[in-house]
Amino acid sequence: MSEYILGGWAQSLADTPPAGFSHTMYGMVTNLAGLTTGTETAPGWSPTNNKAPKIPGNDVLWTYGGGLCSPESMPKTSQQISDIVAAAKDNDWAGVDFDDECNMNIDNLIDTMQQLKPLQTSYTFIAGWAYNNPTASSNGQAINDAVKKISNAGAADRFALMCYATEMWSKADIEANVSQAIERTINDNGVAAKSVILALTPEGLDDWNLNYFLDQVLKYDIGGLYVWNFPLLKGADLNVIKARLGI
């Protein structure tokens, strides 16, 4: 059995992960007020009334948040916290991944994570230039503060570092930010190396950037690798990942 986690996200409950995955996350529950995918006016599926797909060998979580999630500063009330916890516990989910792309309420997020125990939780965030240069922007400082606060509280099992945009970053951006984000998370923000997960996207993935990311997983001996939108991952790339991580 590998010492590394391989997992990822999909947007349809019908998408099943490839062999070798151990963690699968479904979402994105971007309508935070209604706890559905989609938007408040055009909602999709909800973890409140969908059982977790049963996938042998996988811990199956749902993702609260994601790109274009709204409103900001969620969850705001004790009822909203209770609704998140109930959705996970009542429907056989292994836990909840919190993808913070809309300035979530970190104190309430920590409360939610603690109430979810013994289920699993992860905190997912964009680990790019702003994160690596916190003095240059209020957003960068806020991300660092959030990671450190959640880590100090012992609330999240894993921290997933999104080091991509709509596609993989340029070579220059990757070299300037990926290893730096890992080091910042561990050394400055107090996250245990094995709780750090590096995340990539199949869009724009090539031999160089895939192996660069895998190099960092191995160099820092972190927790593993997550793949955004894993149905798009090519079989050849999956084989490289599994071979290099010993899966």
Predicted regions and their residues:
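Cysteine-clustered segments with highest specificity for TGF-beta superfamily mature ligands
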Residues: 223-226
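Chitinase-like catalytic core of GlcNAc-active glycosidases
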Residues: 2-185, 189-211, 215-220, 231-245
